[in-house]
Every structure is written in C-alpha cells, then in structure tokens.
Amino acid sequence: MNYRQLFLLQNVNLESNYLLKRVCLSLKLSPCKLTRKFHHACPSSSKVLKYFRITGCLINFGKQPANDHHLWGHCGARLKHTQSDLIDRFKNANLKSVNEENLKKFFSELENHGNIRQWLKDKFEKDKRAAVCPTTTKSEEEKLENDFEYSFDLEDFSSENFRQYDRGDLLVFYRGSEGIELAACTGTNVWNYSNVLTSINENGTIKEFRTSRVLLRCPNVFKKLKEVQQPLSDVSVPSDVLPFTIKLLKKISQRAQDLSRSHRNEFLRILTEFNIPNKLDNSASFSDLLKFVYKTSKPSPYAKISLLHFLLTESKHFLISDHIFSEIQKVYFLPSSQNDSFDDVVACLRQKSTPYLSFIKKARHLIQVSRDKYKLPISTEEIKPVVYSQVTWTEFEKKLLRYLVQEMIAKSIQSLPNTHLCQVYKEVGLQTHERGLTSDQFAKFLTDIGVWASWQPPRLFQQEYSIAGLGTNPQLDAVYERECNHFKKFVKNELKDSLESQRVDLRHLKAFAFDSSSTKEIDDAISVEELGMSNSWLHIHVANPTSTVDIRSPLGTFAERNFQTIYHPNKIVYMLPLNITQKYWSLDSSSTAQRALTFSAKISKNGDILDYKVRPSFISSVIKYTPQQLDKALHSNRSIAKDIVSGPVDEETKGVSNDHMKDILRIYELSKQACFSRLQKFAFVIAQPTPTVELLPNNVPYNLGDLNHPVYWSSFPTISLNVSEGYSLAESVISECMILAGRVSSLFFQEHKLPGIFRGQPYPIMDGVRRKAFETLLSNRSSWGLVETKYSLSVMPLFESSHLASTPVSHFSLGLKDGYIQSTSPLRRFTDFFTHHQIQSVLLKTPKNTIPDGILRGKLNLYNQKEKSIKTIGRYINRFWALKYIERLPKVQKNIYHGYLMVSELSTPQVMLEELGVKAHIDILPDEAFRLANTRQAFTIKDVFPESNILLVALAT
C-alpha cells in the first residue's frame, strides 16, 4: 500500500463516520440504538449500517482499488444502492421516532450534486481540512450526546471517568522516526474508543491518536476552540473557528523553530551542566531544564516544544520517561555512547568506492560459503563459535558492518525504506524482486556473512533495552559481573537482622510455597491459622531482605539499577546476586528459622478484610509444591471438583501429603472468599492461551560482530513451546493470596500515611455498545473471575496498562478501589523491595529512614519507564522465540490452527491462535472481516517474520 492510499484510508474513514452521524442526527437516535432496532426488525439489514464504517477500509486489505477514480466509484456505487434500501428498511422496521422526511432530505443532499462520486470527492476535500458542524440545535446535540454516553449504573463506576484532555488543548504527539507533531485537541471520538483523541494539525487535517502518543499537553491554548458550545465527544470544528486554530498552530510551530535556532548553545550546555557521570539517578526535571535554558519559571508553549524537540533529536544522550498524564516530569541522561560518525561510510556507499566494492565481493563469497558449509543442525549441546579465518575484515569493513547492523536494528521497529540497506542487499545479488526489504531478510544476510546469529532478536540490541547481564552489551555485562563478585565478598559474614527482636514466632504453622521446580529463589509462602469458629487468618510470608540490607547501601543501589529479575528463554538476570539471595533471604534456605515479613488478613465470608497485621516473623522451613501438584490436589477433592470438572474424579492427590490437605483446602476456601469480594466490584481475568518457551542449551550466545573474522555457529538451539489454556485453579488461588497481601500492604501504608508505590489501572469510558459488551463479559465470569477470550474481544482494546502512582488509585481489572501495593516479591522486584523498606521504618520507629514523598515522586517516572521497557522487551523476546519455533516447523506440520477473529477500527484484524498462544495478523477483505468478527475460525500459517515479530495467517480453505 502506498502513502497516498494510506492517506485516503484515514480520511475516508472519517467521511464514513460523518455520514453515519448525519443519519443518526436526522433520526435523533444513537448508533447503538439504531443498530439494535434496525437489526431486530430485519436481522440481515444491519450490514447496511456497517457500510458507513467499512467503506474506508476497502483499500486496507487485499484488493485495493487501482486508483482514486475506482475508489470513489466504488464508494458512490455502494452509497447509491444504500439510499433506497435504507429508506425501505426503515419503513419495515416501524420505528416511531424515524422522520422519513428528514432521512429523504439527508439523501437529497447527495442527489443535488448530481454525481455521487464527485460529491464524495468534494466532501472529502472539505473534511480533509476539518469536519464542519452539522446544522442541529444545541438541545438536539445534548439529547443525542446523553444517549451516546450511556452512563454506567455500576457501583461508583462513573466516578472513575475523569478526563485529562479537553477541547482547545495544545497536544504534542510523538511520531517515532518522524519526530513530533503539533495539534489542537477537538475532543474524544465516541465513534471510536474513549482513549483515542481527535485533533487537527497545522495543515488542517483531522487525525486520531491514542492518548499514549501524547508527549506534552498545554491546556487552554486555543481559547476560541475551548469556547465552542458542544459536547466534548462532538469532534467537529466550526468553520469560523477553524482558520484561527490553524493560524495559531502555525505560529506556535514557527516560534518553536526560531527558539530552537536561537537557543542552540543553551541546549548543548545542558549536557555539561546536568549530566553527572556515575550517578545512579542521573536525571533532571523538565521544569529545571526549562528554567536553565529560558531563565523563567513560566515558559511559553513554544518554549516547551523547542526544548522537547531538541531532547528527542538528541536521543542518544537523553531519555524522556513515560508520560502517564502528558506532563513530562523527568529527563534522564544516558551514558556516553561509543557511537561513531558514519559519514565516511555513507559517502563510500554513495560513491561505490573501491573499499566498498571489495566488501561486496567478500560478502558474495561468504554467502556461498554459509550455504555450502554452515547449515545449522538442531541440537541440545553447547553452541560453539566457528571462526572462518580465510576472510579478514579491514577497519573500513568493520565500521561498515557496525553501520549496517545499526540500521538493521532500527529497521526492525519501523517500516520506512532504508536506501543503504537496499543498495547493499541488491548489490550482493539477493534482491530479486521489487518488494520492500524487511529486517528479517537483512538479518539473514548478516547471518550469512558471519556478523549476526539467526537467534539474535534485533530489538534487544536497541540502546533503551540495554540490560546488564543479558549478553548484548559487553561493558554492562562486565560491570554486572564485577559487582556481583564484589558483593559476594562484602556479605561473606552473617548479616545483622535489624528486626530480630520484633519477630513473631510462627513456626508452629505449616508454610506452603507453590513454585516451579526450577525456581531458585523462593520469596513467598502461605499459611492458615484457625482461631475458633469462623475465625481464620490467612498469612502470606514474604522474604525480608531489607532487614539486613539498607536500600541506600551499594547493594540496594545495585537492586534499584537492575530493577527486576529478567526472565528470558535464553537467560535469567537476577536483580540481586543469586548466591547471596539463596544463602540469606530465600525462604528455602538451610536455616531452621526463616526470616519473613508476614502480611495477615482476617477474612469475612463475603471476602472483606475484617482485620489485618503486618509483622516481621520467624517461619518454619517451607513445604514446597509445584502449581501442578496443587492443581491436581484441588481437582481431586470432590466438593471442589464437582463444579469445575466433568467425568470421573481422581481420588489421588498426586504428591500432596494427606497431612497437608486440610490446610491447603482451607487456603483454597479463604482465597475464594477474598476473590468473591473483588468480583462484586467487577474484577475479571481474561484467560488467554499463554506460550512458554524453553531452550536447550538455555545459555545461547550472541554474535556481537567484534572479531576480525566472520563467525558461524556449531548448531541451533532446541526450542520447545508449551501453551497453557489460561489460569489454572492453582494459579487462581496463588494469585488471590498475592493480591490479598497487596491489599493489606495498601491498608498499612494508608493507616501510617507512608509514601508508597501504588499500582493502578484506569477505568475506561465506554459508549452504549461497548458497555453492553462489558456487561456480557462480567456475566460470563467463572467463580474465580476468569473470562474466555471470546467474551473480551470487543472491549479488550479499551483496557489500558497498569501503572505506578504515589497515591492510592483504583485498579480496574482487579476490582480494587481502596489501593493496591505489590509487596510479595522483594527478591525479584525493586518496587516490592522499596515497600519493605518503608514498612520497616514504621516497625523500627525510625521515620528518618523513610524515603520522602518528594524523592519518590521524582523517581516514579523512571520506575514506570523501566517497568514498561522490561515488560515490552520480555514480550518481544518470548514472541520472537515462539515465531522461531513456528518458522522451523516442517512444512507438513504447518497445518490448521484455531482462534477468534478480532476486528478493531484502530488496527488490522488479528487472531489469537489457541494451539500456539500467539497473535497473528490476517489478510482478509473488510466485508468478510465484519461478518466473521468475534467468531472462532480455522487458519493456516502464511508467513513468519521473527525479527519483525510478525505472523501472518489466512483463513483455512
């Protein structure tokens, strides 16, 4: 698809939404009510209404129109057919509120232009500048708006629906490699999703962005637009306000460019004034940088934009953290990089100089050598490098290769063509067609010439994902190993326990740890304590490293820098040195009295917390079971199994001792009561298939391209892919206990007014149709809140990711409104480590040791950014290896897979393949996509691109 077609697609979609809105306004009905009544009268006729939404999608899939003439002709033909059909069907529907004259008047507007195709083109040109308000009275608009909003009648639900954006705000959007774009907010488009903003840029073009793309928001800049008296969800711009808005946008853009030129030297001084080497939190607030550059505490919008543009263009020096509410708090200084200037390399590429042609000759030879001699067998043995010493790289060739690798890594995250990669690929004889070059193809070329490994995920080598210990950055890896060895000597003697005198002896209780058999650090265990009739306490015991290590110590700083234990299929990087963790803090260490911080709750029959305690404790040696053993034990109990399994019940507990079953069943009952409380507040868990990738050998080396010769490899690792069908019963029980500890932790922090790291998830704003879909989701939850994927398809795009906050916030999917603080993994998550430190300052009555709220707020953006980066790259790596597994399947095994077709107006249709646990894109025509939306279908694999993280499927024939 070319850029012209993409441009048409975007604007025709706006056109179709505009037409649908005009119909609904004429009928004084919302789209959801109109569709329901229309479908009830004649079920097959609902497709007519869908025309308005899918017309613009025709060029997005498969058969694109050859040119604009065909595009507009097709739109016109569909609309002409719809006119008479729609009026007839409205008559048959017998809708009392339908004004047939208004409907005919609407369609007469088309006929007055004579040529429907020309009318659409004229209308398109107008809407390309801005959507003009329909001629309706204010009362009609407000009445219709009330119908659209369809406020929830769920308990306190509407109180969560606050808006961070308003009409008239100046928005700065991040466009990736294209930089930033200025726009004026015109509202929230109810025809799409509530977390999508509609805006107009300085060219007068209407565009839609997700709120996560907003880098900066300056409120009330466009006062005339702000004063427009229409609902926020009406995203059109009155014609008298439009010219002023565009003119002001251009003025702001021009002033920002002028400031960028005049303050260039001040911008560069930021690096010398604020960048302090070897400082952990090497950052500065955005407001401090503004004061430094402009010498004022109240900079103008264009001053902010000018500085922001500089920080983004110098991305090798700066990192702007995730902006939860579109207000940049911190700017982080990245370590000085060793990036070379590649101007001489680019010049040689353009001129096709002799050194460059010599490289091309070597590359052709190596491609042939690779195909003849180095075909990788699959093996579980250690992977060893095989150096091809017959070819030696010159200094120019090494630099050229570094440049090509850098460009290939950048290519893996963007679809823009790269002329230099295309040139090299073509001149070595690999470009045999006119299709665009993919990062997967170029990675294969680099593998063939011995400077890359076929199992290297390109995005893992991006600077923002550089993680010490993963093997992608030798300098960071060396620092990580050196510090681990240093701490091993530092804590050689027994560490002093600061909470020793306060610990409660709970060794009389059985403590159960439910972890995988491969887990090397046990950081939580569960006990139950019966104190009489219906008086039970559930105890969650958590490893307590902060009692022996201060958060401000070098080891605490080491944990903060690593932030989390990283679990990748080929590598695990521990937040704290593993040998120290296993010896001193893991709950399965050799000590007879394990030290823990115990979170206890007394739970009512309705699952409410009647009382809670947070105490340092001694617990007995933990009793370890795997989740699989727990699951089989729970299913073997008749009173539990009769509601969750069918067929004969296995009487055996499969490895769980009979002496332990009473406590385990009581843990099950109490955790289910706690879950019941959250279910009343609309908690849910979407039970999607989840892939788990295992590699043998599990320590797979990377080719860092730093040798003088090409390097090949002895074998390819063995990949096994295991797919879980969703949450098991055991996982639900364990998860509920951990959530309960988070609830108790939140209560403790609020009672003692402690600065803490709360976790929240915003409540989405839903229109009537999606509200109904969400109610369907809730009504199909299991007794543990699990929801099958098919019930979540239409509302899943509305759900935002969770985030960290310094004050108690609601968590949508957990059904928690009174705050939630994760606290059960201090050996694996620094935020939990921080939580334990704060609690300890209260227990020891040492308020001076408490981390102040101001310092915490200053670091939250960094923590959010780190958590997001770790989560993003973790998903990418797991998917990369899953796609490698699929790519290497024998052709005969690429058979039929199944899944539900997910259709969204903001993205191409996708499928969650149940047997593989991965999402895939599908090439399908829009009419067929809407017809099959949310239905389970059979699919075949079409193409696999692991480096780009893309899987394409087609409907099985």
Curated annotation (Swiss-Prot):
Recorded name of the encoding gene: rpm1
UniProt KW keywords: Exonuclease, Hydrolase, Mitochondrion, Nuclease, RNA-binding, Transit peptide
Protein name: Exoribonuclease II, mitochondrial
Pfam families: RNB
Record SMART domains: RNB
SUPFAM superfamilies for this protein: Nucleic acid-binding proteins (SSF50249)
Main function: Required for intron-independent turnover and processing of mitochondrial RNA. Participates in 3'-mtRNA processing where it hydrolyzes single-stranded RNA or partially double-stranded RNA with 3'-single-stranded tails.
PANTHER family attached to this UniProt entry: DIS3-LIKE EXONUCLEASE 2-RELATED, RIBONUCLEASE
Catalytic activity: Exonucleolytic cleavage in the 3'- to 5'-direction to yield nucleoside 5'-phosphates
GO CC terms, sorted: mitochondrial degradosome; mitochondrial matrix; mitochondrion
Family as reported in the entry's similarity comment: Belongs to the RNR ribonuclease family.
Entry EC no(s): 3.1.13.1
Any single GO BP term: mitochondrial RNA 3'-end processing
InterPro entries, per database record: NA-bd_OB-fold, RNase_II/R, RNR_Ribonuclease
